[in-house]
Amino acid sequence: MNWHVLAQLTVLAFVIAVGPITLIWLSNKKDALL
């Protein structure tokens, strides 16, 4: 497998995993600030 493809898949998986967590964290922060 090309390492560029592997890197893209890793980044994609990372974004999919961290995205929702970041959104939840940001919404919690917003609620705390307000």
UniProtKB/Swiss-Prot annotation:
Location in the cell: Plastid, Chloroplast thylakoid membrane
Top-level taxonomic group: Eukaryota
UniProt-listed Pfam families: PSII_Ycf12
One GO cellular component term noted in the UniProt record for this chain: photosystem II
Keywords assigned: Chloroplast, Membrane, Photosynthesis, Photosystem II, Plastid, Thylakoid, Transmembrane, Transmembrane helix
Keyword Transmembrane: yes
UniProt KW Nucleotidyltransferase keyword: no
Predominant place of localization: plastid
Bilayer disposition of the protein: Single-pass membrane protein
Residue stretches spanning the membrane: 5-25
Listed GO biological process terms: photosynthesis
InterPro entries: PSII_Ycf12_core-subunit
Function: A core subunit of photosystem II (PSII), probably helps stabilize the reaction center.
Subunit structure: PSII is composed of 1 copy each of membrane proteins PsbA, PsbB, PsbC, PsbD, PsbE, PsbF, PsbH, PsbI, PsbJ, PsbK, PsbL, PsbM, PsbT, PsbX, PsbY, PsbZ, Psb30/Ycf12, peripheral proteins of the oxygen-evolving complex and a large number of cofactors. It forms dimeric complexes.
Family per record: Belongs to the Psb30/Ycf12 family.
UniProt name for this protein: Photosystem II reaction center protein Psb30
Lineage: Eukaryota, Rhodophyta, Bangiophyceae, Cyanidiales, Cyanidiaceae
